[in-house]
Amino acid sequence: KKNIYSILNKQFGFDSFRGEQEAIIKRTVVEQKHSLVLMPTGSGKSLCYQIPALYFDNCTIVISPLIALMQDQVDVLKKKNISAAFINSTISKPEKEKRLKEFVEGKIKLLYVTPERFRKTDFVEQIKKAKIDLLAVDEAHCISEWGHDFRPDYSRIGEFRELMGNPLTIALTATATHDIQEDI
């Protein structure tokens, strides 16, 4: 039977959780509650959505602001034999279509995209067909107009969530003042 501890150990090679990871992951997989996670850089925020992504039966969308960050995360996951991919402007149209099709078919467990990807009608039409259990919003401070690197499409994540059938959502950031937290 799948459990968060065996996923932590078998997929990621760790014997125990760090800091608040365990409580956050349990809130997601056991209580099935939305979360806003504030954890310092380097404290293992990514595991807080990656473990639930592997625990749940269906797929996870990860909204991330930086193409380089996406690529790094996907590379790390692939080295651990986890089916992950990204769709962004660095790849060809046929490759984007292939990855999107595989995601909709459930062959890709985690799909990393920028919020701007939701401007693309063909992407949105396909995403509506996918079975999505979890939406992870990385660098969630970008949602807030109070944030130093505000991205307008981040403020539309509520709309994007609806298109996906309102999946369980976890938003993560290392930097969020009280105003930014309220905004998110």
Question: Can you name each region flagged by the protein language model?
Answer:
Residues 31-37, 58-60, 107-109, 167-168:
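Pre-Walker A (Motif I) flank of P-loop NTPase domains
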Residues 128-184:
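Post-DEXD/H (motif II) to motif III coupling segment of the RecA-like Helicase ATP-binding lobe
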Residues 32-51, 61-66, 173:
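Walker A/P-loop
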Residues 1-40:
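Conserved pre-motif I regulatory segment
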Residues 30, 53-55, 77-79, 101-106, ...:
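Conserved catalytic network of the ASCE P-loop NTPase/AAA+ motor domain
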Residues 50, 91-134, 143-148:
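Conserved helix/coil segment N-terminal to the catalytic DExD/H
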Residues 58-80, 91, 95, 114-117, ...:
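Conserved Walker A/P-loop ATP-binding site and its immediately adjacent core
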